[in-house]
């Protein structure tokens, strides 16, 4: 499993040092970094990372308030938050927000490794607790529908709803958001190539270069389905496809 990690740090040198440490780990995919709290909130919603290394003292909204927003307003209880700060005084608040770790700057490579081990242990525990299901229950406007995830080609966010496209060309619409659907399908080979799409990797027919490092992909049996793959998501998709087909 690749771990998608985002850094929020306003000091360039500290940000680059942390990026360097993360790049030495072979199971990490680095999302774009944020330099302040508002930028982090925007990037978080777009890239949906597993882990955030979060500086506390940043311009504008500070790291503690950002974490509270993610936990409460976005109702993301699973995101792993690692606070990085030069101050010991925020330990109690970090505990209340259920941070996985609290790194005091400057921290050593050995201390960083301890944090990474905690991240992996937390993720593996969540993975064990999440059973794979054979069927998926989707709430439609007036009924509940039981579907076979293997028959889903892709799902696309359209406004406040998500349209699920089956390889039979049937389409259903649900008010479940794309992140919820992704979590329900965690035991199946689905990948988020773009903030507005979720695709079944077993149903990908072809992937073609587009521009600026981005790609387009086509789902087999759904000829009209050209789905964008963002530049930042492309490497993760190729890594995931290798894992599925080997």
From Swiss-Prot:
Disulfide topology: none
UniProt superkingdom: Bacteria
Main location: cytoplasm
4-aspartylphosphate: residues bearing it: 55
A Pfam entry, by short name: Response_reg
The HTH LytTR-type domain, residue ranges: 136-243
Keyword set, alphabetical order: Cytoplasm, DNA-binding, Phosphoprotein, Transcription, Transcription regulation, Two-component regulatory system
InterPro entries: CheY-like_superfamily, LytR-like, LytTR_DNA-bd_dom, Sig_transdc_resp-reg_receiver
GO MF, one example: phosphorelay response regulator activity
UniProt subcellular location: Cytoplasm
PTM text: Phosphorylated by LytS.
Domain Response regulatory: 4-120
PROSITE patterns named among the record's database cross-references: HTH_LYTTR, RESPONSE_REGULATORY
This protein's GO CC annotations: cytoplasm
Role description: Member of the two-component regulatory system LytS/LytT that probably regulates genes involved in cell wall metabolism.
Full protein name: Sensory transduction protein LytT
Upper lineage: Bacteria, Bacillati, Bacillota, Bacilli, Bacillales
